[in-house]
């Protein structure tokens, strides 16, 4: 984050604010981890709300503060009232308003200052402040830098747990090429804040309910190979979803 952006951010938060945090539709661990980390960072001195465009996988309910996430599809009236009061909107882990689905029009019509933090390539020019770096492993790693640039001393176990979870999820437990020496250093610093590495791994990867295992079985059973290419693809049919009581996020991590 360059000095001009840092100065703009510090000026914005020089007084109490009404902050809205928005992840992308069907948010994953990186999106929700980013939202919750910023929620905990600003919540003591500001009014802060997280509004998800829709439902997210219940696997992520272990994240500290997840009980405070509002679902726009379930509670439109309450969410729209919050939008009317908001003066700062963070959009996290997406670079195009279309990824916010049913919230995109509310964001574009709002008079609030919009801050994008995202690690995907080619961001749209919708935000007042754009913090974008496609070389970063995850949005959570960027959020860590964002928080450190304002007040690193405020990072506690809750913030560290949320950020670490997002980084681990988006890097495949530090296996993917996006993992850098800096990513590992950030992970180390988060562990120093008491992050329970084993518990997070278990929650993310060994938390399969019976119906989700059956859904995975259906996905494997539907494998198709493209002849002449080292490519295999699959599909999950409407019937598979109905039989296995499918909910958004149940297929998270099946394909990478």
Where are these regions (language model features)?
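An acidic intrinsically disordered interaction segment
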Residues: 1-8, 105-114, 134-143
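Short, motif-level signal for alpha-helix interfacial/capping segments enriched in acidic residues
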Residues: 3-11, 95-97, 147-150
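Hydrophobic helix-and-loop "lid/oligomerization" segment in the mid-to-C-terminal part
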Residues: 2-25, 31-73, 77-88, 169-256
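Solvent-exposed alpha-helices and their adjacent loops that cap or buttress functional pockets
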Residues: 13, 81-84, 106-109, 123-124, ...
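Short alpha-helices
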Residues: 117-186
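Active-site catalytic pocket residues across diverse enzymes, especially alpha/beta-hydrolases
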Residues: 42, 64, 107, 147-150
């Amino acid at each position: 984050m360059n000095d001009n952006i840092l100065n703009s951010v510090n000026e914005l938060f020089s007084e109490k604010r009404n902050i809205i945090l928005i992840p992308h539709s069907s948010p994953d661990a990186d999106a929700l981890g980013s939202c919750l980390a910023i929620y905990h960072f600003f919540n003591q001195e500001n009014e802060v709300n997280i509004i998800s465009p829709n439902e997210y996988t219940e696997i992520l309910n272990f994240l500290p503060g997840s009980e405070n996430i509002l679902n726009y599809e379930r509670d439109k009236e309450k969410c729209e009232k919050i939008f009317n009061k908001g003066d700062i909107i963070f959009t996290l882990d997406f670079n195009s308003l279309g990824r916010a689905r049913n919230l995109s029009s509310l964001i574009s019509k709002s008079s609030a200052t919009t801050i994008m933090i995202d690690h995907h390539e080619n961001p749209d020019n919708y935000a007042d402040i754009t913090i974008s770096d496609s070389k970063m492993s995850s949005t959570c790693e960027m959020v860590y830098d964002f928080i450190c640039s304002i007040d690193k001393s405020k990072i506690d176990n809750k913030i560290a747990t949320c950020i670490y979870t997002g980084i681990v999820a988006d890097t495949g437990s530090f296996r993917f090429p996006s993992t850098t020496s800096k990513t590992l250093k950030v992970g180390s610093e988060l562990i120093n804040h008491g992050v329970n590495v084993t518990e997070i791994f278990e929650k993310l990867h060994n938390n399969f309910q019976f119906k989700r295992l059956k859904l995975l079985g259906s996905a494997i059973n539907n494998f198709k190979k493209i002849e002449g290419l080292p490519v295999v693809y699959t599909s999950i049919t409407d019937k598979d979803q109905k039989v296995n009581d499918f909910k958004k996020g149940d297929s998270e991590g099946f394909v990478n």
